[in-house]
A protein has these predicted regions:
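Cysteine-dependent hydrolase recognition
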Residues: 1-371
Length: 371
């Protein structure tokens, strides 16, 4: 009788064939557990050793890099670059150590947040609050790895993701912002809560990708590719129609951003590529928009901003810029990409998204994305 979990009682019973009978006082709803003492119970077995760690004993750090053990060498190489070039204090930690100290050994994305919360809370007395968190590994929506779609995916270099409570395709999302909500009682209202540090992710799955992306990042940090191209910014805006009720919304939004840049940073050369300013082909596409984007990227842009419809493989219904274009790109000047669109840079899918391809292109594409 386990009705009272703090006062479990053994009940004698008689088993006659498939019928079990026992006597118990009536008067209340009770809960019982059947234990067959003549059966063999599972025996605990050793499945591995838990390496000792002491993340709680770390001193305050400017930056934390979470990396799978097989990628630690490349993560440490990036940490050295930030120490030497930016003067940051950086610590590389493994997810297993975080789980052991912050979620009782269970893989849980919230453990990453609890680690950063520890450093953040300590800063009230020790100073030096954490400034950056880098997730050095790709993510996937199924943190438990139980769905058929992810069975063939190698998990060794993956990191967990925060998933929204909603599961419908229109309302569900993944975001790493969650790990930066460190104030007490924050993290439940993303539109209101304040991020307490900068957080980013390298969506890498292999040592080769890790090596290439660290090479790419360090090269950008060294600023060897300086020049007037870093004064160029481009704003691209989708068209609209009555069916989607957007009409000129995307163009107006992009133009507001462009005008703000022109006002606050008059030294920048602002380029505007708005679909409705170009001729639509008989196939319903905008070949001139594609050509203009390609030309501007080749000439060099500090930043390229897109506002409009999109998917994991292309911009706009007209596919003015696609994942194939990104993979085949060879321009050497690496812009920062800002994409106010749908799941262009989805990082929690089995397949690599177009936005991920921007970053993962070893010699072209882009240096970072806000998306």
């Amino acid at each position: 009788d386990v009705t009272d979990a703090l006062n479990v009682k053994r009940v004698e019973a008689d088993l006659n064939g498939s019928e079990l009978s026992f006597t118990i006082p009536a008067g209340r709803l009770r809960e019982f557990v059947l234990v067959q003492t003549n059966q063999t119970f599972p025996s605990p077995e050793v499945v591995g050793e838990v390496a000792s760690s002491n993340l709680h004993g770390l001193e305050q750090r400017d930056m934390i890099i979470i990396s799978a053990p097989s990628l630690v060498q490349q993560a440490e190489r990036l940490a050295v670059a930030h120490r030497e070039k930016d003067g940051l204090t950086v610590e590389v930690v493994t997810p297993e150590a975080i789980y052991n100290e912050f979620s009782s050994g269970t893989p849980d994305a919230t453990a990453y947040r609890r680690l950063m919360k520890m450093f953040y809370d300590r800063s009230s007395s020790l100073g030096n609050p954490p400034k950056y968190l880098l997730l050095f590994g790709d993510g996937i929506y199924d943190n438990r790895g139980i769905s058929g779609e992810v069975q063939g995916v190698s998990w060794s270099n993956m990191l967990l993701t925060f998933q929204s409570q909603e599961s419908l395709n229109v309302y569900s999302y993944a975001t790493d912002d969650y790990f930066a909500f460190l104030e007490d009682n924050s993290g439940s209202n993303f539109s209101r809560d304040k991020m307490c540090l900068g957080v980013g992710r390298f969506p890498i799955r292999t040592v080769t990708e890790a090596t290439q992306m660290v090479d790419k990042t360090i090269s950008y940090m060294e600023n060897k590719d300086s020049g007037s191209w870093k004064n160029n910014v481009t704003f691209v805006a989708d068209d609209g129609n009555n069916e989607d009720s957007f009409t000129t919304n995307h163009m107006k939004q992009a133009d507001q951003l462009a005008e703000a840049i022109e006002e606050m940073q008059p030294g920048f050369l602002v380029n505007k590529v708005y679909f409705d300013a170009y001729k639509r082909s008989s196939l319903g596409t905008y070949p001139d928009v594609h050509n203009e984007i390609e030309k501007l990227l080749k000439s060099g842009q500090l930043l390229i901003n897109y506002t409009g419809h999109g998917s994991t493989t292309h911009w706009a219904d007209e596919s003015v810029w696609t994942q194939t274009d990104i993979n085949n790109s060879s321009y050497k000047h690496l812009p920062v990409w800002v994409t106010a669109t749908c799941d262009f840079t989805r990082f929690d899918d089995v397949k690599t998204s177009a936005g991920e391809s921007v970053f993962l292109n070893p010699t072209s594409g882009g240096i970072a994305l806000f998306t």
